[in-house]
């Protein structure tokens, strides 16, 4: 499905960056600030690009600029009209992430959700061979997957031998499926336009853009170890597959796990390993020595910062008023 990703810069040194996505007026900006500081702590050589929808307010954009982020405003991407029930209402926003394929001023990008923290340098992932889509395999064991045959029969690709896939009853085993909260990809205009055209003819499914990206890139998907996107549910679903002290990237995607909202009251949030990971996130967020010190004018970005946020269509406005229009996170096993 994916066209050749060969839209390279033909001159100068390859540009690389990390990229994340932010929407709405909620508190998810704290996650992105924390991510920027985490990348700085690991001494990453590359900037953090934040793709923002038009409704992200000026004060949030200023916070991100003050942390050295590059702001790139994008327009929403809407799925075809249908009656799909998304696993979470705000997953519909995630289709806007497709816009990051048009950031062709960069030769390679690593996408990270705003509820992710990077605890060890992962710049080496930029050196993975071109032409592939790299991400970590997801887990099918949480209730958000209850609509799938995998969940119903207890099958998970994290432990495929525990419950084998019944080919005689359900047909061929599903292809490998990644969590779209973190992935390594190459921007490409041909791919970007083909993604948008394909979206017009592929019916939306419960996990929104994550299902779509899995379908689109299935032929070039290459799994990478779970240390590069530790989905928290792995700690209680597949502890045998996890060495917590080796995790380089932690994805705070379980219900109640967002550090800036953490109460410890939701299921599994009383675990000591979860509390430790939340504390590690706060240690980075509160570390003033990690703040980006930039005494120069933010050239070329003033217009984005001071422009009055645009009003999105009524559906997005309704989500915002319901306090769910925030940074779109990838669906996960949690």
UniProtKB/Swiss-Prot annotation:
It comes from the Eukaryota. InterPro entries: Glyco_trans_8 (IPR002495), GNT1/Glycosyltrans_8 (IPR050587), Nucleotide-diphossugar_trans (IPR029044). It is found in: Cytoplasm. Keywords: Carbohydrate metabolism, Cytoplasm, Galactose metabolism, Glycosyltransferase, Manganese, Metal-binding, Transferase. It catalyses: myo-inositol + UDP-alpha-D-galactose = alpha-D-galactosyl-(1->3)-1D-myo-inositol + UDP + H(+). Induction: Induced by cold in a DREB1A-dependent manner; this induction is accompanied by a reduction in trimethylation of 'Lys-27' of histone H3 (H3K27me3) in GOLS3 promoter. Induced by methylviologen (MV), a superoxide radical generating drug. Its cofactor is a divalent metal cation. The keyword Transferase applies. SUPFAM superfamilies: Nucleotide-diphospho-sugar transferases (SSF53448). GO terms for molecular function: inositol 3-alpha-galactosyltransferase activity; metal ion binding. Gene3D superfamilies: Spore Coat Polysaccharide Biosynthesis Protein SpsA, Chain A (3.90.550.10). The active site is at residue 97. Pfam families: Glyco_transf_8 (PF01501). GO terms for biological process: galactose metabolic process; response to cold; response to oxidative stress. It is an enzyme of class 2 (transferase). One of its GO terms (cellular component) is cytoplasm. Mn(2+) binds at residues 113, 115, 251. Its EC number is 2.4.1.123. CDD domains: GT8_Glycogenin. Belongs to the glycosyltransferase 8 family. Galactosyltransferase subfamily. PANTHER family: GLYCOGENIN SUBFAMILY MEMBER. Galactinol synthase involved in the biosynthesis of raffinose family oligosaccharides (RFOs) that function as osmoprotectants. May promote plant stress tolerance. This is Galactinol synthase 3. It comes from Arabidopsis thaliana (Mouse-ear cress).
């Amino acid at each position: 499905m994916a066209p050749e990703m060969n839209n390279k810069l033909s001159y100068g040194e390859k540009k690389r960056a990390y990229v994340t996505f932010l929407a709405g007026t909620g508190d998810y900006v704290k996650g992105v600030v924390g991510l920027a500081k985490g990348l700085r702590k690991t001494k990453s050589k590359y900037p953090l690009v934040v793709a923002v929808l038009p409704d992200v307010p000026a004060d949030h954009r200023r916070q991100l600029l003050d942390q050295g982020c590059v702001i790139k405003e994008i327009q929403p991407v809407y799925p075809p009209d249908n009656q799909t029930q998304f696993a979470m209402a705000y997953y519909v926003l995630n289709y806007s992430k497709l816009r990051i394929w048009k950031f062709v001023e960069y030769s390679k990008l690593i996408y990270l959700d705003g509820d992710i923290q990077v605890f060890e340098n992962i710049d080496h992932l930029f050196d993975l061979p071109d032409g592939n889509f790299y991400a970590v395999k997801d887990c099918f064991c949480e209730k958000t997957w209850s609509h799938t045959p995998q969940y119903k029969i207890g099958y998970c690709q994290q432990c495929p031998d525990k419950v084998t896939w019944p080919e005689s009853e359900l047909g061929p085993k599903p292809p490998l499926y990644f969590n779209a909260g973190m992935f390594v990809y190459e921007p490409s205009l041909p791919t970007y336009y083909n993604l948008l055209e394909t979206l017009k003819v592929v019916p939306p499914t419960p996990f929104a853009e994550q299902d779509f990206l899995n379908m689109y890139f299935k032929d070039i998907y290459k799994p990478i170890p779970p240390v590069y996107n530790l989905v928290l549910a792995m700690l209680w679903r597949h502890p045998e597959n996890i060495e917590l002290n080796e995790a380089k990237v932690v994805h705070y995607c379980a219900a109640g796990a967002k550090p800036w909202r953490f109460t410890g009251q939701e299921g599994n949030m009383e675990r000591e390993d979860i509390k430790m990971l939340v504390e590690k996130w706060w240690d980075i967020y509160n570390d003033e020595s990690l703040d980006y010190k930039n005494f120069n004018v933010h050239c070329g970005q003033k217009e984005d910062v001071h422009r009055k946020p645009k009003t999105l269509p009524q559906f997005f406005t309704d989500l915002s008023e319901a306090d769910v229009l925030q940074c779109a996170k990838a669906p996960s096993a949690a």
